[in-house]
Amino acid sequence: MVYEERDYRIKAGKLAQFVKIYGEYGLPLQKKHLGTFVAYFTTEIGELNHVVALWGYESLGDRETRRKAMLADPEWQTYLDRVTDLIDIQTTRILNPVSYSPLQ
C-alpha cells in the first residue's frame, strides 16, 4: 500500500470555512472515488492554517485511476469552485511504509 499526504495551507482567517466545506462536500465525494481515508488533521502549533489529509491506495496506478475518475466528476468540479479561493498553497507527497510501520 502507498499513502498520499496532501497538505493545504489555507488563507488566514479561512481555515474554519475550508474545514466545514470539505467535511460537507469534499470528503463525501472523495470517499466515493478514492482509496482508504486514513486521517485528516489541522495544525495547532508551528506553521498554522494547514490541513493535512492522508489517503491509502493499493498502488500508484490505483491512485491514478481513482483520481482521474474523481476529477471527471462534475460534483468534484463544483466543490473545487467552492474552495479554490480559500487555498494558498498545496503540496502532495507519496509515502511508502517501512517494514515495521503499523500502517502497511
Residue map of PLM features:
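Glycine-rich beta-strand-turn "strand-cap" elements at beta-sheet edges
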Residues: 11, 36-52, 58, 77-104
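Short, conserved loop/turn and helix-capping segments at secondary-structure boundaries
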Residues: 24, 70-73
